Amino acid sequence: SDLEKAGVNFSQERGNYDLTMEGGHSSKRVAHVADKTGQSVQTNLLAQVQQKQNITLFEHYLAVDLLIDGNTCHGAYVFDKKSHQVISFVSHKTILATGGASKSYLYTSNPDTSTGDGIAMAFRAGCEIVNMEFTQFHPTCLFHPHAKSFLISETLRGEGAKLILPNGEEFMHNYDDRLELAPRDTVARAIDHEMKTHGFDCVYLDISFKDSKWISKRFPNITERCSTLGIDICSKPIPVVPAAHYTCGGVNTDLSAQSNIDNLYAIGEVAHTGVHGANRIASNSLLECIVFAKSCAKNINKNSIGNIFPTINAWDASRVEPSKEMVVVTHLWHEVRRIMWNFVGIVRSDNRLKSASHRLQKIHKEVNDYYQLYTITDDLIELRNLVQISKIIVESALSRKESRGLHFNQDYPKQLDKAHNSVIIKS
């Protein structure tokens, strides 16, 4: 395969792929690299990029906004984190591959960079943003004061791990016949219900009944990380909580990754291709990244690329000054994430969504006013995007008068007969 040619060595068992299964799967279908498949794919592809003489990597840069003329994209304004200057990257074709927006929530499995930057920029440029209410909450993020955003892979449950309460009692049989292998939304809601009903800080995932040598070999990364925190997963259950994990919505694209803005493409989690529906099945995200990246490249290569650019105005920073109140940015960052977790989380209601909308409207105005007055920083850029994305998520959630997939509203607990997309466009 292309990935194997790039150096990804999938785990083998007797000369064949060691396939595993995860939530929502009916059979073993996932090729993996122990318990760090994503890391292996990313590391090897990055090594390939670094060897290419015709590719230049610009590290420590952060996109601010897309360069749009009419309905055509010509690149982006980009913030240099070292010089603190904004420069223009002009291009014939622009591809967004910026990931999702799970950092909108207080608890997430994602890194700090998952602030929905690409989706927010695309929205401001006039792109269709689709189905942003479908945020997937992964059921099992490690719960520990010294662990940040560490995911306990779904493959543990695929290999037989059980979810238990602090007293050791199993509970998934109360929610779904598929038990721990029910889809993520079902498992996350079950855990959330048990925690809120009983006042627990977390539940536990137990695989300690398996052979310890097998556990260490099959899950070396999880075993090591938990061990550094004093948790021996071979003899003790793992404390876990649900956390925001994946953005199923995003920039609407066709099968070639083209958005409704000419020369602007989106691939990976930033995009809404439609393949995940209202609830992504485990491990399909890596497949989507590879398939649509290749489709995007083919589409660009078969079309002619011109050599004429419009005149791009330089970034104007003459009317702003350095801020002496960065505490405002820090405070609003935390406030947005708490609002999203408390009012727009795993279980929603119209009252909570309207309350979130009201609060976010005020914060959005405050951030935009701040943005117009002061010199931009990377934190301010990400806060601006975070607030914009949070508003879009709430607006999308309020527009859906049903419960479907990852969106569960207590006021509309049933699913409508006919599926539809929620589409948000800048007015």
Sequence positions of predicted segments:
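Glycine- and aromatic-enriched mobile tails/lids
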Residues: 2, 8-28, 164-180, 191-194, ...
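Flavin (primarily FAD) binding-site architecture
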Residues: 96-108
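Alpha-helix capping and helix-loop boundary segments enriched in small/acidic/polar residues
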Residues: 36, 86, 105-113, 147-151, ...
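Hydrophobic/aromatic ligand-binding patch that stacks against planar heteroaromatic rings
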Residues: 94, 121, 256
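Thiamine diphosphate
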Residues: 110-123, 129
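An anion/pyrophosphate-binding glycine-rich loop and adjacent beta-alpha core
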Residues: 121, 127-238, 290, 299-305
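Conserved redox-cofactor binding core of oxidoreductases
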Residues: 2-85, 90-93, 97, 141-144, ...
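FAD-site-proximal beta/loop scaffold in flavoenzymes
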Residues: 65-83, 88, 231-275, 281
